[in-house]
Regions:
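Basic/polar N-terminal segments that are highly enriched at the extreme N-terminus
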Residues: 1-4
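Intrinsically disordered, low-complexity, positively charged segments
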Residues: 7-66
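Glycine- and acidic-residue-biased ligand/ion/polar-headgroup-sensing regions
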Residues: 43, 50-55, 72-96
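Short hydrophobic-aromatic micro-motifs
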Residues: 46-47, 83, 108-110, 130-133
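Short beta-strand His + acidic residue motifs that chelate non-heme Fe in jelly-roll/DSBH
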Residues: 91-93, 116-123
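Short acidic-glycine-tyrosine-enriched beta hairpin
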Residues: 96-111
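Double-stranded beta-helix
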Residues: 124-164
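Conserved small/polar residues in nucleotide/adenosyl-binding loops
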Residues: 169-170
């Protein structure tokens, strides 16, 4: 797991573009059948990527949870949001024995205290790409799947300004 430290604000003011990229940019999040994780000391956030192709992958694969977080399992005191950003793919997430199918741009929130989380792809020819962000949690909420079709769609901008994005709130 890559660990990123916060930078000194005085030093940051004089960073070059290259230095900013080195400090902030996360690359290489998707490797077949691996979990890639980047821990940031800023807000104690963990950004993760997983692209299961030929096997089912556990959320803590390659992460020493005890050494990095002082917990027995990854979500003991953390919560996580998971998006499938693999186009034309269906991803399967199993959280404590409950199976969730995520289509492209679907989101799954998993609450703290969930012991086992695994990832798989329905079709290895079109693997799911799970983009995840985990944060410390202090209470439990209901684990919930939110399909892209059920997300709040909020059109922004205008055709006249050639800027007409849509904000999707899960």
């Amino acid at each position: 797991m890559d660990i990123r430290y916060s930078c000194n604000q005085k030093d940051f003011k004089r960073y070059t573009t290259e230095e900013m990229r080195d400090e902030m940019l996360i690359t290489g999040l998707y490797k077949a059948d691996e979990v890639v994780a980047v821990y940031s000391h800023v807000d104690r956030m963990v950004t993760l990527g997983c692209m299961p192709v030929h096997e089912t992958v556990s959320i803590d694969k390659g992460i020493d949870v005890w050494a990095n977080f002082g917990t027995h399992y990854f979500l003991e005191r953390r919560e996580i949001g998971i998006f499938n950003i693999g186009k034309d793919s269906t991803g399967i997430v199993v959280a404590d024995g409950v199976k969730y199918e995520l289509g492209y741009k679907d989101c799954l929130y998993i609450t703290q205290g969930t012991k086992e989380v695994t990832f798989a792809s329905a079709d290895p020819e079109h693997p799911a790409k799970f983009y995840m962000v985990s944060a410390p949690a202090h209470c439990s909420y209901e684990t919930r799947l939110i399909k892209m079709a059920d997300a709040n769609h909020r059109p922004l901008g205008s055709v006249e300004t050639c800027n007409k994005p849509v904000s999707y709130t899960h």
